Amino acid sequence: MRIELEKATKLDRIRADYNVHYWSQGFYGIDDQGEVYVSPRSDRAHQIPFSAIVNELEAQQLNLPVLVRFPQIVHQRVHGICHAFNQAIEEYQYPNKYLLVYPIKVNQQREVVDEILASQAQLETKQLGLEAGSKPELLAVLALAQQGSSVIVCNGYKDREYVRLALIGEKLGHKVFIVLEKLSELDLVLEEAKSLGVKPRLGLRIRLASQGAGKWQASGGEKSKFGLSASQVLSVIERLKREGSLDAMQLVHFHLGSQMANIRDVRNGVNESARFYCELRALGANIEYFDVGGGLAVDYDGTRSQSSNSMNYGLAEYARNIVNTVGDVCQQYEQPMPVIISESGRSLTAHHAVLISNVIGTETYQPEEVHELGVDAPLLLQNMWRNWENLQDGTDARALIEIYNDTQSDLAEVHSQFATGVLNLEQRAWAEQLSLRIYFELSRKMSTKNRFHRPILDELSERLADKFFVNFSLFQSLPDAWGIDQVFPVLPLSGLGDAEERRAVMLDITCDSDGAIDHYVDGQGIESTLPVPAWSKDKPYLMGFFLVGAYQEILGDMHNLFGDTHSAVVNVDEHGQFEISYINEGDSVEDMMRYVHIDVDAIRDNYKQLVSQRVEANEQAQILAELEQGLAGYTYLEDF
Protein backbone atom coordinates (compact mmCIF):
# COMPACT_ATOMS: atom_id res chain seq x y z
CA MET A 1 0.00 0.00 0.00
CA ARG A 2 2.82 2.38 0.89
CA ILE A 3 4.62 1.65 -2.39
CA GLU A 4 1.43 2.39 -4.36
CA LEU A 5 0.95 5.64 -2.45
CA GLU A 6 4.54 6.70 -3.14
CA LYS A 7 4.09 5.88 -6.83
CA ALA A 8 0.86 7.90 -6.99
CA THR A 9 2.51 10.84 -5.26
CA LYS A 10 5.45 10.67 -7.64
CA LEU A 11 3.17 10.57 -10.69
CA ASP A 12 1.22 13.57 -9.39
CA ARG A 13 4.50 15.43 -9.08
CA ILE A 14 5.47 14.43 -12.61
CA ARG A 15 2.06 15.51 -13.95
CA ALA A 16 2.68 18.88 -12.33
CA ASP A 17 6.19 19.04 -13.83
CA TYR A 18 4.83 18.59 -17.35
CA ASN A 19 1.77 20.78 -16.58
CA VAL A 20 -0.31 18.52 -18.83
CA HIS A 21 -3.61 19.22 -17.10
CA TYR A 22 -3.46 22.90 -18.00
CA TRP A 23 -2.10 23.03 -21.55
CA SER A 24 -3.97 19.95 -22.80
CA GLN A 25 -7.53 21.18 -22.10
CA GLY A 26 -8.24 17.64 -20.89
CA PHE A 27 -7.48 16.00 -24.24
CA TYR A 28 -4.19 14.48 -23.04
CA GLY A 29 -2.91 13.18 -19.72
CA ILE A 30 -0.64 10.76 -17.86
CA ASP A 31 -2.25 7.60 -16.47
CA ASP A 32 -1.34 5.70 -13.31
CA GLN A 33 1.12 3.53 -15.24
CA GLY A 34 3.09 6.56 -16.37
CA GLU A 35 1.74 6.32 -19.94
CA VAL A 36 0.66 9.40 -21.89
CA TYR A 37 -2.86 9.02 -23.26
CA VAL A 38 -5.32 10.83 -25.49
CA SER A 39 -8.99 11.29 -24.61
CA PRO A 40 -10.54 12.83 -27.73
CA ARG A 41 -14.23 12.16 -27.09
CA SER A 42 -16.45 14.79 -25.51
CA ASP A 43 -17.42 12.47 -22.65
CA ARG A 44 -13.72 11.91 -21.76
CA ALA A 45 -14.76 8.33 -20.99
CA HIS A 46 -11.82 6.59 -22.64
CA GLN A 47 -8.07 7.04 -22.37
CA ILE A 48 -6.03 5.63 -25.25
CA PRO A 49 -2.28 5.23 -24.56
CA PHE A 50 -0.09 6.57 -27.33
CA SER A 51 1.99 3.40 -27.11
CA ALA A 52 -1.05 1.43 -28.32
CA ILE A 53 -1.52 3.82 -31.25
CA VAL A 54 2.15 3.49 -32.20
CA ASN A 55 1.89 -0.31 -32.07
CA GLU A 56 -1.00 -0.16 -34.52
CA LEU A 57 0.87 2.25 -36.80
CA GLU A 58 3.83 -0.13 -36.87
CA ALA A 59 1.48 -3.04 -37.60
CA GLN A 60 0.39 -1.08 -40.67
CA GLN A 61 4.04 -0.70 -41.75
CA LEU A 62 4.23 3.00 -40.92
CA ASN A 63 7.61 4.14 -39.66
CA LEU A 64 8.09 7.04 -37.28
CA PRO A 65 7.88 10.01 -37.29
CA VAL A 66 4.11 10.20 -37.72
CA LEU A 67 1.78 13.15 -37.25
CA VAL A 68 -1.36 11.83 -35.56
CA ARG A 69 -4.62 13.74 -35.94
CA PHE A 70 -7.66 13.41 -33.71
CA PRO A 71 -10.66 14.88 -35.59
CA GLN A 72 -12.91 14.47 -32.56
CA ILE A 73 -10.79 17.12 -30.85
CA VAL A 74 -11.42 19.47 -33.78
CA HIS A 75 -15.15 18.92 -33.36
CA GLN A 76 -14.94 19.73 -29.66
CA ARG A 77 -12.98 22.91 -30.29
CA VAL A 78 -15.65 24.08 -32.76
CA HIS A 79 -18.41 23.30 -30.29
CA GLY A 80 -16.48 24.89 -27.41
CA ILE A 81 -15.92 28.22 -29.15
CA CYS A 82 -19.47 28.43 -30.51
CA HIS A 83 -20.91 27.47 -27.12
CA ALA A 84 -18.88 30.16 -25.36
CA PHE A 85 -20.23 32.87 -27.67
CA ASN A 86 -23.78 31.51 -27.60
CA GLN A 87 -23.70 31.54 -23.80
CA ALA A 88 -22.37 35.11 -23.75
CA ILE A 89 -25.08 36.21 -26.20
CA GLU A 90 -27.71 34.67 -23.94
CA GLU A 91 -26.16 36.11 -20.78
CA TYR A 92 -26.03 39.68 -22.10
CA GLN A 93 -29.28 39.34 -24.08
CA TYR A 94 -27.39 40.32 -27.22
CA PRO A 95 -29.97 40.50 -30.03
CA ASN A 96 -27.92 38.90 -32.77
CA LYS A 97 -25.80 35.81 -33.47
CA TYR A 98 -22.21 34.59 -33.70
CA LEU A 99 -20.35 32.99 -36.61
CA LEU A 100 -17.05 31.11 -36.41
CA VAL A 101 -14.95 31.56 -39.55
CA TYR A 102 -11.96 29.28 -40.09
CA PRO A 103 -8.95 30.86 -41.86
CA ILE A 104 -7.60 27.94 -43.83
CA LYS A 105 -4.06 29.39 -43.82
CA VAL A 106 -3.75 27.94 -40.30
CA ASN A 107 -3.98 24.41 -41.66
CA GLN A 108 -5.12 23.80 -45.22
CA GLN A 109 -5.02 20.00 -45.03
CA ARG A 110 -8.20 18.63 -46.60
CA GLU A 111 -8.96 16.31 -43.70
CA VAL A 112 -8.73 19.24 -41.26
CA VAL A 113 -11.04 21.58 -43.22
CA ASP A 114 -13.50 18.75 -43.84
CA GLU A 115 -13.69 17.90 -40.14
CA ILE A 116 -14.26 21.52 -39.17
CA LEU A 117 -17.20 21.73 -41.57
CA ALA A 118 -18.46 18.27 -40.59
CA SER A 119 -18.57 19.26 -36.93
CA GLN A 120 -21.90 21.03 -37.48
CA ALA A 121 -23.25 18.84 -40.26
CA GLN A 122 -26.10 17.59 -38.07
CA LEU A 123 -27.12 21.04 -36.84
CA GLU A 124 -30.07 22.80 -38.43
CA THR A 125 -28.52 26.23 -37.81
CA LYS A 126 -24.84 26.31 -38.69
CA GLN A 127 -22.37 28.84 -37.36
CA LEU A 128 -19.39 28.11 -39.59
CA GLY A 129 -17.69 29.89 -42.45
CA LEU A 130 -14.29 29.88 -44.15
CA GLU A 131 -11.68 32.56 -44.79
CA ALA A 132 -9.22 32.82 -47.66
CA GLY A 133 -6.18 35.07 -47.82
CA SER A 134 -4.96 34.33 -51.35
CA LYS A 135 -6.15 33.15 -54.76
CA PRO A 136 -5.16 29.51 -54.17
CA GLU A 137 -6.95 29.50 -50.83
CA LEU A 138 -10.03 31.12 -52.35
CA LEU A 139 -10.22 28.51 -55.11
CA ALA A 140 -10.04 25.80 -52.46
CA VAL A 141 -12.64 27.46 -50.25
CA LEU A 142 -15.12 27.92 -53.10
CA ALA A 143 -15.16 24.14 -53.55
CA LEU A 144 -14.89 23.09 -49.91
CA ALA A 145 -17.46 25.46 -48.40
CA GLN A 146 -20.86 23.95 -47.92
CA GLN A 147 -23.55 25.14 -50.27
CA GLY A 148 -25.18 28.12 -48.67
CA SER A 149 -22.40 28.22 -46.07
CA SER A 150 -22.77 31.08 -43.63
CA VAL A 151 -19.94 33.21 -45.01
CA ILE A 152 -16.72 33.22 -46.98
CA VAL A 153 -14.40 36.05 -45.98
CA CYS A 154 -11.77 37.14 -48.51
CA ASN A 155 -8.76 38.81 -46.92
CA GLY A 156 -5.28 39.61 -48.21
CA TYR A 157 -4.09 41.66 -51.16
CA LYS A 158 -6.16 41.21 -54.29
CA ASP A 159 -5.68 41.50 -58.02
CA ARG A 160 -8.38 41.46 -60.67
CA GLU A 161 -8.46 37.67 -60.89
CA TYR A 162 -8.85 37.31 -57.12
CA VAL A 163 -11.75 39.77 -57.15
CA ARG A 164 -13.48 38.02 -60.06
CA LEU A 165 -13.16 34.65 -58.33
CA ALA A 166 -14.69 36.09 -55.16
CA LEU A 167 -17.61 37.52 -57.12
CA ILE A 168 -18.05 34.23 -58.97
CA GLY A 169 -18.45 32.70 -55.51
CA GLU A 170 -21.70 34.66 -55.20
CA LYS A 171 -22.91 33.05 -58.43
CA LEU A 172 -22.06 29.65 -56.91
CA GLY A 173 -24.43 30.32 -54.03
CA HIS A 174 -21.96 31.46 -51.39
CA LYS A 175 -22.15 34.60 -49.29
CA VAL A 176 -18.74 36.12 -50.07
CA PHE A 177 -17.35 39.18 -48.30
CA ILE A 178 -14.50 40.95 -50.08
CA VAL A 179 -12.57 42.77 -47.36
CA LEU A 180 -10.79 45.85 -48.68
CA GLU A 181 -7.17 46.00 -47.50
CA LYS A 182 -6.18 49.03 -49.61
CA LEU A 183 -8.00 51.75 -51.54
CA SER A 184 -7.09 50.52 -55.02
CA GLU A 185 -9.03 47.29 -54.43
CA LEU A 186 -12.32 49.20 -54.43
CA ASP A 187 -11.95 50.12 -58.11
CA LEU A 188 -11.31 46.49 -59.03
CA VAL A 189 -14.36 45.28 -57.12
CA LEU A 190 -16.72 47.86 -58.60
CA GLU A 191 -15.46 47.26 -62.15
CA GLU A 192 -15.65 43.47 -61.98
CA ALA A 193 -18.97 43.44 -60.13
CA LYS A 194 -20.45 45.48 -62.98
CA SER A 195 -18.81 43.19 -65.55
CA LEU A 196 -20.20 40.04 -63.94
CA GLY A 197 -23.55 41.51 -62.98
CA VAL A 198 -23.02 40.70 -59.31
CA LYS A 199 -23.81 42.89 -56.33
CA PRO A 200 -20.69 42.73 -54.16
CA ARG A 201 -20.58 42.31 -50.40
CA LEU A 202 -17.82 44.58 -49.15
CA GLY A 203 -15.91 44.68 -45.91
CA LEU A 204 -13.42 47.18 -44.53
CA ARG A 205 -10.29 46.19 -42.66
CA ILE A 206 -9.70 48.93 -40.12
CA ARG A 207 -6.17 49.88 -39.11
CA LEU A 208 -6.57 50.44 -35.38
CA ALA A 209 -4.39 52.44 -33.05
CA SER A 210 -4.85 49.66 -30.50
CA GLN A 211 -2.09 47.09 -30.53
CA GLY A 212 -1.50 43.86 -28.69
CA ALA A 213 1.75 42.58 -27.25
CA GLY A 214 3.92 39.61 -28.14
CA LYS A 215 5.37 38.02 -31.25
CA TRP A 216 2.56 39.16 -33.56
CA GLN A 217 2.01 42.70 -32.29
CA ALA A 218 2.99 44.16 -35.69
CA SER A 219 -0.31 42.77 -37.05
CA GLY A 220 -2.09 45.61 -35.28
CA GLY A 221 -1.43 49.27 -34.66
CA GLU A 222 -0.99 52.22 -36.99
CA LYS A 223 2.12 50.74 -38.66
CA SER A 224 0.51 47.40 -39.46
CA LYS A 225 0.88 45.87 -42.92
CA PHE A 226 -2.85 45.63 -43.58
CA GLY A 227 -5.88 47.83 -43.24
CA LEU A 228 -7.23 51.28 -43.98
CA SER A 229 -6.65 54.44 -41.96
CA ALA A 230 -9.55 56.58 -40.76
CA SER A 231 -9.19 58.98 -43.72
CA GLN A 232 -9.06 56.07 -46.19
CA VAL A 233 -12.19 54.59 -44.64
CA LEU A 234 -13.99 57.89 -45.23
CA SER A 235 -12.73 57.92 -48.84
CA VAL A 236 -14.28 54.49 -49.41
CA ILE A 237 -17.61 55.62 -47.96
CA GLU A 238 -17.68 58.77 -50.11
CA ARG A 239 -16.83 56.78 -53.25
CA LEU A 240 -19.58 54.24 -52.57
CA LYS A 241 -22.07 57.05 -51.99
CA ARG A 242 -21.17 58.58 -55.36
CA GLU A 243 -21.59 55.19 -57.02
CA GLY A 244 -24.90 54.59 -55.28
CA SER A 245 -23.44 51.42 -53.79
CA LEU A 246 -23.16 52.25 -50.11
CA ASP A 247 -25.44 49.32 -49.31
CA ALA A 248 -22.66 47.00 -50.54
CA MET A 249 -20.62 47.87 -47.44
CA GLN A 250 -21.74 45.16 -45.02
CA LEU A 251 -18.79 44.16 -42.82
CA VAL A 252 -16.15 45.81 -40.65
CA HIS A 253 -13.02 43.84 -39.79
CA PHE A 254 -9.91 44.28 -37.70
CA HIS A 255 -7.06 42.05 -36.56
CA LEU A 256 -4.91 42.74 -33.52
CA GLY A 257 -2.56 39.82 -34.10
CA SER A 258 -2.34 36.09 -33.53
CA GLN A 259 -1.99 34.62 -30.02
CA MET A 260 -3.31 37.56 -27.99
CA ALA A 261 -2.21 36.71 -24.46
CA ASN A 262 -3.89 39.58 -22.58
CA ILE A 263 -7.67 39.91 -22.55
CA ARG A 264 -7.33 43.64 -21.91
CA ASP A 265 -5.70 44.09 -25.33
CA VAL A 266 -8.59 42.20 -26.93
CA ARG A 267 -11.15 44.35 -25.15
CA ASN A 268 -9.41 47.60 -26.12
CA GLY A 269 -9.25 46.59 -29.78
CA VAL A 270 -12.89 45.53 -29.86
CA ASN A 271 -13.94 48.79 -28.22
CA GLU A 272 -12.07 50.91 -30.78
CA SER A 273 -13.37 48.90 -33.71
CA ALA A 274 -16.93 49.04 -32.38
CA ARG A 275 -16.62 52.84 -32.43
CA PHE A 276 -15.68 52.60 -36.13
CA TYR A 277 -18.73 50.41 -36.70
CA CYS A 278 -21.06 52.91 -35.05
CA GLU A 279 -19.55 55.87 -36.92
CA LEU A 280 -19.90 54.06 -40.25
CA ARG A 281 -23.51 53.19 -39.48
CA ALA A 282 -24.14 56.85 -38.69
CA LEU A 283 -22.69 57.76 -42.11
CA GLY A 284 -25.27 55.53 -43.78
CA ALA A 285 -23.33 52.30 -44.26
CA ASN A 286 -25.65 49.35 -43.69
CA ILE A 287 -23.02 47.24 -41.93
CA GLU A 288 -24.42 44.06 -40.37
CA TYR A 289 -21.28 42.03 -39.59
CA PHE A 290 -18.53 42.77 -37.07
CA ASP A 291 -15.42 40.60 -37.66
CA VAL A 292 -12.96 40.64 -34.75
CA GLY A 293 -10.41 38.63 -36.73
CA GLY A 294 -8.04 36.22 -35.03
CA GLY A 295 -6.18 36.46 -31.78
CA LEU A 296 -7.88 33.82 -29.62
CA ALA A 297 -4.80 32.31 -28.03
CA VAL A 298 -3.64 28.81 -27.13
CA ASP A 299 -2.17 28.20 -23.69
CA TYR A 300 0.92 26.38 -24.93
CA ASP A 301 2.69 26.38 -21.56
CA GLY A 302 -0.41 26.06 -19.37
CA THR A 303 0.51 28.98 -17.11
CA ARG A 304 -2.66 31.06 -17.77
CA SER A 305 -0.43 34.14 -17.94
CA GLN A 306 0.37 37.08 -20.22
CA SER A 307 3.38 35.22 -21.63
CA SER A 308 3.48 35.08 -25.43
CA ASN A 309 3.10 31.30 -25.09
CA SER A 310 0.00 31.55 -22.94
CA MET A 311 -3.25 33.45 -22.32
CA ASN A 312 -4.70 35.00 -19.18
CA TYR A 313 -8.30 34.13 -20.08
CA GLY A 314 -10.50 31.23 -21.13
CA LEU A 315 -13.01 30.77 -23.94
CA ALA A 316 -15.93 31.99 -21.86
CA GLU A 317 -14.12 35.16 -20.76
CA TYR A 318 -12.99 35.86 -24.33
CA ALA A 319 -16.54 35.57 -25.67
CA ARG A 320 -18.07 37.61 -22.83
CA ASN A 321 -15.61 40.47 -23.31
CA ILE A 322 -16.30 40.69 -27.04
CA VAL A 323 -20.08 40.38 -26.80
CA ASN A 324 -20.35 42.75 -23.85
CA THR A 325 -18.04 45.39 -25.37
CA VAL A 326 -19.77 45.41 -28.76
CA GLY A 327 -23.17 45.53 -27.09
CA ASP A 328 -22.23 48.39 -24.77
CA VAL A 329 -20.76 50.56 -27.54
CA CYS A 330 -23.73 49.97 -29.85
CA GLN A 331 -26.16 50.76 -27.06
CA GLN A 332 -24.27 53.93 -26.19
CA TYR A 333 -24.46 55.21 -29.79
CA GLU A 334 -27.94 53.79 -30.45
CA GLN A 335 -26.88 51.54 -33.31
CA PRO A 336 -28.14 48.00 -34.03
CA MET A 337 -25.95 45.22 -32.74
CA PRO A 338 -24.23 43.31 -35.57
CA VAL A 339 -23.55 39.64 -36.20
CA ILE A 340 -20.23 38.89 -34.49
CA ILE A 341 -17.59 36.93 -36.41
CA SER A 342 -14.27 35.62 -35.13
CA GLU A 343 -11.51 33.99 -37.19
CA SER A 344 -10.18 31.65 -34.50
CA GLY A 345 -8.00 29.26 -36.48
CA ARG A 346 -5.16 28.62 -34.04
CA SER A 347 -7.51 27.79 -31.18
CA LEU A 348 -9.53 25.50 -33.45
CA THR A 349 -6.70 23.33 -34.72
CA ALA A 350 -3.67 23.45 -32.42
CA HIS A 351 -4.78 20.74 -29.98
CA HIS A 352 -5.81 18.10 -32.49
CA ALA A 353 -2.37 17.06 -33.81
CA VAL A 354 0.58 15.34 -32.12
CA LEU A 355 3.91 14.51 -33.72
CA ILE A 356 5.25 11.16 -32.50
CA SER A 357 8.85 10.17 -33.09
CA ASN A 358 11.56 7.96 -31.65
CA VAL A 359 14.82 8.73 -29.89
CA ILE A 360 17.57 7.14 -31.97
CA GLY A 361 20.46 7.78 -29.61
CA THR A 362 21.70 9.85 -26.72
CA GLU A 363 24.80 11.54 -25.45
CA THR A 364 24.93 11.49 -21.66
CA TYR A 365 27.34 12.53 -18.94
CA GLN A 366 28.16 9.96 -16.29
CA PRO A 367 30.52 11.02 -13.48
CA GLU A 368 33.95 9.47 -13.97
CA GLU A 369 36.89 9.22 -11.62
CA VAL A 370 39.55 11.78 -12.54
CA HIS A 371 43.08 11.14 -11.24
CA GLU A 372 45.52 13.81 -10.11
CA LEU A 373 48.31 14.68 -12.50
CA GLY A 374 51.94 14.53 -11.49
CA VAL A 375 53.82 17.30 -9.69
CA ASP A 376 55.26 18.45 -13.01
CA ALA A 377 51.80 19.21 -14.42
CA PRO A 378 51.28 22.77 -15.70
CA LEU A 379 50.27 25.25 -13.01
CA LEU A 380 46.92 25.88 -14.71
CA LEU A 381 45.94 22.23 -14.37
CA GLN A 382 47.17 22.14 -10.77
CA ASN A 383 44.88 25.08 -9.99
CA MET A 384 41.94 23.18 -11.45
CA TRP A 385 42.78 20.16 -9.27
CA ARG A 386 42.95 22.39 -6.20
CA ASN A 387 39.43 23.64 -6.91
CA TRP A 388 38.27 20.04 -7.13
CA GLU A 389 39.85 19.22 -3.76
CA ASN A 390 38.27 22.28 -2.16
CA LEU A 391 34.89 21.25 -3.52
CA GLN A 392 35.25 17.76 -2.05
CA ASP A 393 36.28 19.12 1.34
CA GLY A 394 33.02 21.05 1.66
CA THR A 395 32.59 24.77 1.12
CA ASP A 396 30.10 27.52 1.88
CA ALA A 397 27.64 28.92 -0.64
CA ARG A 398 29.90 31.81 -1.66
CA ALA A 399 32.88 29.51 -2.25
CA LEU A 400 30.76 27.36 -4.57
CA ILE A 401 30.23 30.38 -6.82
CA GLU A 402 33.96 31.13 -6.78
CA ILE A 403 34.80 27.55 -7.74
CA TYR A 404 32.32 27.75 -10.61
CA ASN A 405 33.77 31.02 -11.90
CA ASP A 406 37.36 29.77 -11.51
CA THR A 407 36.55 26.57 -13.40
CA GLN A 408 34.93 28.54 -16.22
CA SER A 409 37.98 30.79 -16.48
CA ASP A 410 40.51 27.95 -16.19
CA LEU A 411 38.78 25.88 -18.87
CA ALA A 412 38.76 28.84 -21.28
CA GLU A 413 42.49 29.26 -20.65
CA VAL A 414 43.06 25.53 -21.27
CA HIS A 415 41.42 25.86 -24.68
CA SER A 416 43.54 28.91 -25.45
CA GLN A 417 46.78 27.19 -24.43
CA PHE A 418 45.88 24.09 -26.44
CA ALA A 419 45.30 26.23 -29.53
CA THR A 420 48.77 27.81 -29.14
CA GLY A 421 50.50 24.49 -28.49
CA VAL A 422 51.25 24.99 -24.77
CA LEU A 423 49.01 22.08 -23.70
CA ASN A 424 48.70 18.76 -25.49
CA LEU A 425 45.59 16.73 -26.33
CA GLU A 426 45.78 14.50 -23.24
CA GLN A 427 46.01 17.54 -20.98
CA ARG A 428 43.04 19.20 -22.66
CA ALA A 429 40.96 16.02 -22.34
CA TRP A 430 41.90 15.74 -18.63
CA ALA A 431 40.88 19.37 -17.99
CA GLU A 432 37.55 18.93 -19.75
CA GLN A 433 36.76 15.76 -17.80
CA LEU A 434 37.67 17.41 -14.51
CA SER A 435 35.57 20.49 -15.27
CA LEU A 436 32.55 18.28 -15.98
CA ARG A 437 33.13 16.46 -12.69
CA ILE A 438 33.28 19.82 -10.89
CA TYR A 439 30.11 21.01 -12.61
CA PHE A 440 28.33 17.81 -11.63
CA GLU A 441 29.28 18.19 -7.96
CA LEU A 442 28.33 21.87 -8.00
CA SER A 443 24.89 20.98 -9.38
CA ARG A 444 24.37 18.70 -6.36
CA LYS A 445 25.64 21.17 -3.76
CA MET A 446 24.08 24.42 -4.97
CA SER A 447 20.55 25.30 -3.91
CA THR A 448 17.65 26.84 -5.81
CA LYS A 449 16.79 28.63 -2.56
CA ASN A 450 19.90 30.78 -3.03
CA ARG A 451 19.05 33.38 -5.68
CA PHE A 452 22.73 33.73 -6.65
CA HIS A 453 22.87 29.99 -7.32
CA ARG A 454 19.81 29.86 -9.58
CA PRO A 455 21.33 31.22 -12.82
CA ILE A 456 24.38 29.00 -12.30
CA LEU A 457 22.16 25.96 -11.74
CA ASP A 458 20.33 26.76 -14.99
CA GLU A 459 23.65 26.87 -16.82
CA LEU A 460 24.82 23.64 -15.18
CA SER A 461 21.55 21.94 -16.06
CA GLU A 462 22.15 22.74 -19.73
CA ARG A 463 25.79 21.62 -19.60
CA LEU A 464 25.03 18.31 -17.93
CA ALA A 465 21.75 17.51 -19.68
CA ASP A 466 21.46 14.40 -21.81
CA LYS A 467 21.26 15.04 -25.53
CA PHE A 468 18.39 13.12 -27.11
CA PHE A 469 18.68 12.70 -30.87
CA VAL A 470 15.11 12.47 -32.13
CA ASN A 471 14.11 11.21 -35.56
CA PHE A 472 12.52 14.38 -36.94
CA SER A 473 13.33 17.74 -38.51
CA LEU A 474 12.61 20.78 -36.37
CA PHE A 475 12.45 22.91 -39.53
CA GLN A 476 9.84 20.65 -41.14
CA SER A 477 7.63 19.75 -38.18
CA LEU A 478 8.08 22.56 -35.61
CA PRO A 479 9.25 25.56 -37.65
CA ASP A 480 7.88 28.07 -35.13
CA ALA A 481 10.09 26.58 -32.41
CA TRP A 482 13.05 27.55 -34.57
CA GLY A 483 11.80 30.73 -36.19
CA ILE A 484 10.09 32.58 -33.33
CA ASP A 485 10.99 30.54 -30.22
CA GLN A 486 7.44 29.23 -29.93
CA VAL A 487 7.06 26.80 -27.02
CA PHE A 488 5.40 23.45 -27.68
CA PRO A 489 4.75 20.88 -24.94
CA VAL A 490 7.18 17.97 -25.32
CA LEU A 491 7.27 14.80 -23.25
CA PRO A 492 8.18 11.11 -23.40
CA LEU A 493 5.11 8.99 -24.09
CA SER A 494 5.78 6.19 -21.60
CA GLY A 495 7.80 5.31 -18.51
CA LEU A 496 7.01 8.61 -16.84
CA GLY A 497 7.08 7.03 -13.42
CA ASP A 498 10.85 7.44 -13.78
CA ALA A 499 10.75 10.86 -15.40
CA GLU A 500 12.86 12.45 -12.69
CA GLU A 501 15.90 10.30 -13.44
CA ARG A 502 17.51 12.62 -15.98
CA ARG A 503 17.20 15.97 -17.70
CA ALA A 504 17.60 16.24 -21.45
CA VAL A 505 17.44 18.45 -24.52
CA MET A 506 15.88 17.37 -27.82
CA LEU A 507 17.97 17.56 -30.99
CA ASP A 508 16.74 16.76 -34.48
CA ILE A 509 18.59 14.85 -37.21
CA THR A 510 19.31 17.76 -39.54
CA CYS A 511 22.88 18.90 -40.13
CA ASP A 512 22.18 22.23 -38.48
CA SER A 513 23.06 23.41 -35.00
CA ASP A 514 19.73 25.28 -34.89
CA GLY A 515 17.94 21.94 -35.01
CA ALA A 516 17.37 21.87 -31.26
CA ILE A 517 14.45 22.64 -28.99
CA ASP A 518 15.58 25.34 -26.57
CA HIS A 519 12.50 25.80 -24.38
CA TYR A 520 10.38 23.26 -22.48
CA VAL A 521 7.24 23.45 -20.39
CA ASP A 522 8.28 22.66 -16.82
CA GLY A 523 5.72 23.20 -14.08
CA GLN A 524 4.53 26.79 -14.07
CA GLY A 525 7.41 28.04 -16.16
CA ILE A 526 9.75 27.48 -19.08
CA GLU A 527 13.09 25.69 -18.70
CA SER A 528 16.00 24.93 -21.02
CA THR A 529 15.94 21.19 -20.24
CA LEU A 530 13.23 18.55 -19.77
CA PRO A 531 12.86 15.90 -17.03
CA VAL A 532 12.90 12.47 -18.68
CA PRO A 533 13.30 8.78 -17.88
CA ALA A 534 16.74 7.40 -18.71
CA TRP A 535 17.11 6.18 -22.29
CA SER A 536 17.78 2.53 -23.03
CA LYS A 537 18.78 1.16 -26.40
CA ASP A 538 16.98 -2.08 -25.58
CA LYS A 539 13.46 -0.67 -25.98
CA PRO A 540 11.78 2.02 -28.09
CA TYR A 541 11.79 5.49 -26.59
CA LEU A 542 8.92 7.59 -27.93
CA MET A 543 8.63 11.36 -27.76
CA GLY A 544 5.44 13.36 -28.30
CA PHE A 545 5.32 16.95 -29.56
CA PHE A 546 1.91 18.42 -28.74
CA LEU A 547 -0.32 21.29 -29.93
CA VAL A 548 1.25 21.28 -33.40
CA GLY A 549 -2.00 21.42 -35.38
CA ALA A 550 -1.82 25.14 -36.23
CA TYR A 551 0.54 26.56 -38.88
CA GLN A 552 3.37 24.02 -38.42
CA GLU A 553 2.63 21.75 -41.38
CA ILE A 554 2.26 24.48 -43.95
CA LEU A 555 5.19 26.55 -42.65
CA GLY A 556 7.55 23.57 -42.46
CA ASP A 557 10.50 23.65 -44.85
CA MET A 558 12.65 20.98 -46.45
CA HIS A 559 16.03 21.55 -44.81
CA ASN A 560 18.35 18.64 -45.72
CA LEU A 561 15.51 17.40 -47.96
CA PHE A 562 13.54 16.02 -45.01
CA GLY A 563 9.97 16.02 -46.28
CA ASP A 564 6.48 15.77 -44.90
CA THR A 565 6.06 13.08 -42.28
CA HIS A 566 3.47 10.35 -42.48
CA SER A 567 0.14 11.39 -41.00
CA ALA A 568 -2.67 9.30 -39.59
CA VAL A 569 -6.23 10.09 -38.55
CA VAL A 570 -7.38 8.32 -35.37
CA ASN A 571 -10.95 8.08 -34.09
CA VAL A 572 -12.22 6.53 -30.85
CA ASP A 573 -15.67 4.92 -30.63
CA GLU A 574 -18.10 4.87 -27.70
CA HIS A 575 -16.62 1.58 -26.48
CA GLY A 576 -13.10 2.97 -26.23
CA GLN A 577 -11.82 1.22 -29.33
CA PHE A 578 -9.63 3.32 -31.59
CA GLU A 579 -9.33 3.06 -35.34
CA ILE A 580 -6.78 4.48 -37.75
CA SER A 581 -9.29 5.88 -40.21
CA TYR A 582 -6.90 7.33 -42.76
CA ILE A 583 -3.18 7.29 -43.52
CA ASN A 584 -1.36 9.79 -45.70
CA GLU A 585 2.15 8.59 -46.48
CA GLY A 586 4.95 11.12 -46.13
CA ASP A 587 7.42 12.17 -48.78
CA SER A 588 9.88 9.73 -50.27
CA VAL A 589 13.43 10.65 -51.21
CA GLU A 590 12.35 10.68 -54.85
CA ASP A 591 9.49 13.07 -54.02
CA MET A 592 11.92 15.52 -52.45
CA MET A 593 14.39 15.30 -55.33
CA ARG A 594 11.66 16.08 -57.82
CA TYR A 595 10.51 19.02 -55.68
CA VAL A 596 13.93 20.65 -56.05
CA HIS A 597 13.93 19.82 -59.79
CA ILE A 598 16.48 17.01 -59.67
CA ASP A 599 15.92 14.69 -62.63
CA VAL A 600 15.42 11.36 -60.89
CA ASP A 601 15.53 9.44 -64.15
CA ALA A 602 18.95 10.95 -64.84
CA ILE A 603 19.97 9.99 -61.31
CA ARG A 604 19.04 6.38 -62.03
CA ASP A 605 21.03 6.43 -65.26
CA ASN A 606 24.05 7.78 -63.38
CA TYR A 607 23.71 5.03 -60.79
CA LYS A 608 23.66 2.38 -63.51
CA GLN A 609 26.71 3.86 -65.21
CA LEU A 610 28.71 4.09 -61.99
CA VAL A 611 27.74 0.59 -60.89
CA SER A 612 28.67 -0.92 -64.25
CA GLN A 613 32.07 0.80 -64.14
CA ARG A 614 33.02 0.31 -60.49
CA VAL A 615 31.17 -2.70 -59.04
CA GLU A 616 31.84 -6.40 -59.59
CA ALA A 617 29.31 -8.02 -61.91
CA ASN A 618 27.96 -10.37 -59.25
CA GLU A 619 27.16 -7.40 -56.93
CA GLN A 620 25.67 -4.99 -59.44
CA ALA A 621 22.04 -6.10 -59.15
CA GLN A 622 22.09 -5.89 -55.36
CA ILE A 623 23.73 -2.45 -55.31
CA LEU A 624 21.25 -1.07 -57.85
CA ALA A 625 18.36 -2.53 -55.88
CA GLU A 626 19.56 -0.82 -52.69
CA LEU A 627 19.95 2.50 -54.46
CA GLU A 628 16.45 2.18 -55.91
CA GLN A 629 15.11 1.26 -52.49
CA GLY A 630 16.73 4.40 -51.09
CA LEU A 631 14.98 6.59 -53.66
CA ALA A 632 11.63 5.04 -52.80
CA GLY A 633 12.21 5.18 -49.04
CA TYR A 634 11.11 7.59 -46.32
CA THR A 635 13.27 10.68 -45.92
CA TYR A 636 13.63 10.01 -42.18
CA LEU A 637 15.69 7.29 -40.50
CA GLU A 638 14.03 3.88 -40.72
CA ASP A 639 16.37 1.40 -39.03
CA PHE A 640 15.79 2.34 -35.39
Swiss-Prot record:
CC cofactor: Mg(2+); pyridoxal 5'-phosphate
One short Pfam name that applies is Orn_Arg_deC_N
Which residues bind substrate per the record? 290-300
Q: Does the keyword field hold Flavoprotein?
A: no
| Documented EC number(s) | 4.1.1.19
Q: Per the UniProt entry, what is one GO biological process?
A: arginine catabolic process
The record lists the catalysed reaction(s) as: L-arginine + H(+) = agmatine + CO2
| Function, as annotated | Catalyzes the biosynthesis of agmatine from arginine.
Q: What is this protein called?
A: Biosynthetic arginine decarboxylase
Q: Gene encoding this chain?
A: speA
